[in-house]
């Protein structure tokens, strides 16, 4: 199968006077792959950010010979990774003709290209009703509201879709509301959603009520990332108020927002009640000392949170003392990230040294505390990873 595809691809590339993509040849000369039932499978694993692909990233003109070459074996395609290439709507229109017949496709990664609204429309039409498509990543492209609305159609048509990454594009609330509406009324199958860094024309905190209402009725979503949404205290109040009635969301990433210490009273209220969140990322916000004090207060009685990130919040020695003393009463936290872009002092280092001794070996902080040559306690960064850490993060 691979030999036949390579022969066809070579002929078409030479005929079109195109640069021969070395990564395509290398993949097609590797041994055939088989599924458990013995059938052959074929992938398109050509990410442009791989070291050996960087200088031969795929362009629109490469899609024609590539798509035609694979068309004879389109039913064998399972995974396509064309991330970090140079594809625009023109190249995506050609790829979509292949995708239309790829009935067994399971994952599609188009992150880091230049796909606009028209490309999203082509993809939506080609991918609708694909019964095995479970993962779709179109992060870091250039589409806006119309493109996101086209992608949103997959939430109504593709029941197998579990992970959707549409972050870092140019949509605003019109596009976002189309997604939250689908998850509020129809779709209960999607488990992971990344909507990082939209391009707001108007930022009204009350629009986050659309996420809140989604929390009330959605029973499928387990992971949500809302990095870089300019979230302030009003939105925090809305989100955590509605989260109290949600029993399925386990991982929430709110890093890189404008969450201030006043917001933490609502987080405290949520955490101190019957919460289910297992992972909360509040890094790169504005919690300061009082914010982590309130956060620690909520964690005193919390029994669900296992992963917490509060790096880059300008916490000082005073705040860490208050935070650490409250963490002493928590029994479930397994991983704590708080070293970078905060300020430690002798008192807080002593408190956290006692905290680490209490937690024991099955704890994964991003710091270590040691005794220096002057027999004084000091702190340093330590990279640690808890088992199955990917379960606590959003891609």
Features from the language model and the residues they span:
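Leucine-rich tandem repeat or coiled-coil scaffolds
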Residues: 1-395
